[in-house]
Amino acid sequence: MAVVTTKQLLESGVYFGHATRKWNPKMKPYIFTSRNGIHIINLKKTSEEIEKAYQELLNIITSGGKALFLGTKKQIQSSIREEAQRSQQYYVDHRWLGGTLTNFKTILKRIELLHLLHKQEEEGLWKKLPKKEVVKLKRKRDKLEKFLGGIKDMKNLPQAIFIFDPEKESIAVAEARKLGIKVFGIVDTNCDPDLVDYIIPANDDAIRGVKLIIWLMANACVQGNGGVAEKAETFDAKNPLKPQNYNTLNKRPYQDSPRKPSYQNQNQR
């Protein structure tokens, strides 16, 4: 049984690419057609690539590996955090700190400091300090929690990294590739698919579509850990469908309803 249906992809608006003038020629195999100066992504290809990514991530987790979810755009931060927590994986939902992977020993020292600050507060040690000093310590703890909270339990490097926007997170991509960590990523028509090992061609500005893909990758991790993947009904309940509201991240100038009969026949052409 397919992990995602064409109907789900259609309703989530993942098939809208960028303006044709902004396209990356390497994305040609994943483009179905163009309309009104906008590339339309081939949903059959998207479905196939999601299936490949899902199975590979499932295999990695089943083999005892761990994944890191990365997405720092404000609109999807909560989804990255919640789905990573649901699937018991690591995440970064704010700015990527250079060297998080390639200089992991230094990052571990910062993580140790974060744990120490939490421990000191829990044990009541801060109550003995001047108020001004406590304010400084809280500020330091909160900053560390903001950037390292999602990886504070990460004692070793992950075996996979799922990236919402590989072009924006180019430093993380470079670090992962240097270390041989498998890179999974959502790639729009203006992006370079060579940046990732497992490409998911999709509209990276369709909030519901992006959340759908993050949810699917989290399901792969849940299943890899021996759990039961959530059903589509659960995703729909958490992310109610809002027709004609798929492009609110960067507000692309689409003027037609995403669900047109001509696109529903993609798999038949």
From Swiss-Prot:
Pfam families: Ribosomal_S2 (PF00318). GO terms for cellular component: cytosolic small ribosomal subunit. It comes from the Bacteria. Residues 235-269 are annotated as: Disordered. The keyword Ribosomal protein applies. Keywords: Ribonucleoprotein, Ribosomal protein. The keyword Ribosomal protein applies. InterPro entries: Ribosomal_uS2 (IPR001865), Ribosomal_uS2_bac/mit/plastid (IPR005706), Ribosomal_uS2_flav_dom_sf (IPR023591). One of its GO terms (molecular function) is structural constituent of ribosome. One of its GO terms (biological process) is translation. Belongs to the universal ribosomal protein uS2 family. HAMAP family: Ribosomal_uS2_B (MF_00291_B). This is Small ribosomal subunit protein uS2. The lineage of its organism: Bacteria, Bacillati, Mycoplasmatota, Mollicutes, Acholeplasmatales.
